Amino acid sequence: MEKVINNTYEDILIEEKIGSITLDLKKFNLLEYVIKTRLILYITKKIFGTANGIEKKHVEDIIILCGNNIGNKFLTPNKNLKITVRNKKIYFEKQN
């Protein structure tokens, strides 16, 4: 499963910087629900080194936000992470 998630991540990745990851919204929305949830946790681990603080409800809210495809909306599942949907992209950003 980890290999599938890693390959999917590489496929939909637009840009990766320290503390920030940008994904293609259209490709993300085409994924299966299980892959989306694992991918969100994978990205959180990639940014912070752990997925602690991200609960099932947060992951569901992120998937709903992306599925609604409404621009300029964001979520802050915890005080350190901000997820924004803008310009057909998903931005995962570490907050300082």
Task: Please provide the spans of the model-predicted regions.
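AMP-forming adenylation/ATP pyrophosphatase catalytic core
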Residues: M1-N96
